[in-house]
Amino acid sequence: MQPQPLKVMVAVGARPNYMKAAPLIRALTGPSTAVETGRPPIELTVTHTGQHYEDGLSRTQFEELSLPAADVNLNVGSGPHGRQTGLILQRFEPVLEEQWPDVLVVAGDVNSTLACALVAAKSWRRLPGGGWKRPRIAHIEAGLRSFDPTMPEETNRRLTDALSDDLLIHSPEARGNLL
């Protein structure tokens, strides 16, 4: 019997996030060793919020990083923090509900990072045998801190870390910030 695929969704919103998520996306879309290891196959969905979006630049960025084109584009565009975050919340929720991944991966500290993590953290489904489940949330670049409360990104980082189940750190300093 074939194991159920592990459904992974990677949500990106800005150019720096593509670079942070690129190694993971390439690993998940590369040759599978699921048969040899006994691990389930992976079903990947890449969602681009369009937070910082220029068609030619985004396409070039995906190509330069050897990434597949995004499966979903929310086309949010630039704008004030509240408007942009609100649009991402509104547009990402139905995508998450339809795709229903086992794991949502977010990267960095932009409004997309926080908004997508918040949607997943609030999305629960009742299990057939009882109990509840939501997608696990993994945060790439967890623990990064500027210690500048006037930076919107600092708020996004701290809140995303608090919402996440898996904190993917990049340095000993980041680990220390999470302890």
Question: At which residue positions do the language-model features occur?
Answer:
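An aromatic- and histidine-rich active-site surface loop
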Residues: 105-127
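Short, well-structured alpha-helical segments in soluble
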Residues: 89-100
